[in-house]
């Protein structure tokens, strides 16, 4: 009797092309990422975000349409820890959990990139670009994608 081979495990924190494509195409495939954070008064918060995008090999970004919204207030009040969750069962199983620290980046080049890389649906909800760019420096990525187990750490 043969033992099935274990799937490969990636431990270096570097977003793979498959992870980037999944995150960047989520809304186009009718999915959004769940984003969890802690409010300034210490309460857990959870919301769906359609503009989550891979920003670099070690960062995600979100265009936050409301510059006074809860996640922005949390980050600005010293509660930068953010978790994001993605799951799908078909056409193939993908489960991803991202953990990191968010920061508002006001540099015009960053704002422009995050806004323009957001899905058109999201951009159309903030045509005047009143939102802010939230960049998440990742600490870990866990999950399963493309036959690979992810246990990535910074």
Protein language model annotation of sequence segments:
Residues 1-154:
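Binding-site signature for planar aromatic cofactors or substrates
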């Amino acid at each position: 009797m043969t033992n099935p081979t274990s799937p490969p495990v990636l431990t270096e924190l570097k977003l793979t092309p498959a992870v980037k494509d999944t995150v960047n195409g989520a809304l186009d495939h009718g999915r959004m990422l769940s984003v969890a954070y802690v409010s300034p008064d210490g309460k857990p918060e959870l919301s769906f975000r359609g503009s989550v995008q891979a920003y670099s090999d070690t960062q995600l970004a979100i265009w936050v349409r409301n510059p006074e919204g809860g996640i922005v207030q949390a980050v600005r009040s010293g509660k930068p820890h953010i978790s994001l969750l993605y799951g799908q069962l078909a056409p193939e199983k993908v489960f991803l959990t991202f953990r990191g620290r968010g920061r508002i980046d006001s540099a015009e080049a960053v704002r422009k990139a995050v806004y323009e890389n957001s899905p058109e649906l999201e951009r159309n909800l903030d045509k005047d670009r009143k939102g802010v760019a939230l960049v998440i420096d990742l600490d870990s990525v866990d999950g399963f994608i493309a036959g690979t187990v992810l246990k990535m750490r910074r």
